[in-house]
Swiss-Prot record:
Residues within the DNA-binding region(s): 31-51
Role: Represses a number of genes involved in the response to DNA damage (SOS response), including recA and lexA. In the presence of single-stranded DNA, RecA interacts with LexA causing an autocatalytic cleavage which disrupts the DNA-binding part of LexA, leading to derepression of the SOS regulon and eventually DNA repair.
Family membership: Belongs to the peptidase S24 family.
Species the sequence originates in: Verminephrobacter eiseniae (strain EF01-2)
Signal peptide: none
Protein name: LexA repressor
Pfam families linked to this entry: LexA_DNA_bind, Peptidase_S24
Alphabetical keyword list: Autocatalytic cleavage, DNA damage, DNA repair, DNA replication, DNA-binding, Hydrolase, Repressor, SOS response, Transcription, Transcription regulation
Catalytic-site annotation from UniProt: 142 (for autocatalytic cleavage activity), 179 (for autocatalytic cleavage activity)
EC number: 3.4.21.88
Oligomeric and partner information: Homodimer.
Length: 224
């Protein structure tokens, strides 16, 4: 747990919940989810704590989206320091992660093909609960309400498997997209987090692959 003397115990609980949810799902919780998890009477109570955290510089609130919560870089560094112990010395995993930044993906090419790598970034070891394999530059606003907006860098763990409700990187035909996965007995749907965008229904026989799982979100200001 991040020990920040500026925060009340309740604010610390909210901050820990945000960080843990982002590490587990790749997206921050909604106000309603915070209220339900911490036993608040309403989402308004959660909003009051979020506003206090924003005033104290622990988070940034993005208007117009239910998941518009971002951890500031100094908060992330403090969480990392707390995980590493008081000195961080002698930790064999203390070297930074060197991750390729993937830009536009050409049709039919593997995501990690060299021509897609714009540059590499060093990211603090342990910043996320699961080590990502690459960073994917987000284009567009289809995942806005999950707090993922144009220009963000999505931390992705390469995998072919995902559970319902997780945010994935999917290849559908020649296109690569970031969406929330929903599977039923008969269908696969890729859900946007923005009502202005349609649900993508994977048609029978249509080429579809899960390329990766979102394990976190960072911005350029959070990078070393």
């Amino acid at each position: 747990m991040l020990d920040n003397p500026k925060l009340t115990a309740r604010q610390q609980q909210v901050l820990d919940l945000i960080q843990n949810t982002m590490a587990r799902t790749g997206a921050p919780p909604t106000r309603a989810e915070i209220a339900a998890e911490l036993g608040f009477k309403s989402a308004n109570a959660a909003e009051e704590h979020l506003q206090a955290l924003a005033r104290k510089g622990a988070i940034e609130l993005v208007s117009g989206t239910s998941r518009g919560i971002r951890l500031h870089s100094e908060t992330l560094r403090s969480i990392h320091a707390a995980r590493s112990g008081p000195s961080g010395a002698g930790n064999p995993g203390s070297s930074p992660w060197v991750l390729p930044l993937i830009g536009r993906v050409a049709a039919g090419s593997p995501i990690l093909a060299q021509e897609h790598v714009e540059q590499t970034y060093s990211v603090e070891n342990g910043l996320f609960q699961h080590k990502p394999d690459y960073l994917l530059k987000v284009r567009g606003m289809s995942m806005r309400d999950a707090g993922i907006i144009d220009g963000d860098l999505l931390a992705v763990q390469a995998t072919r498997e995902a559970r319902n409700g997780q945010i994935i990187v999917a290849r559908l035909g020649d296109d690569v997209t970031v969406k929330r996965l929903r599977r039923t007995a008969s269908t696969i749907e890729l859900l946007p987090e923005n009502p202005d965008y349609p649900v993508i229904v994977v048609q029978p026989g249509e080429p579809f692959e899960i390329e990766g799982l979102a394990v976190g979100l960072i911005r350029n200001t959070m990078l070393m």
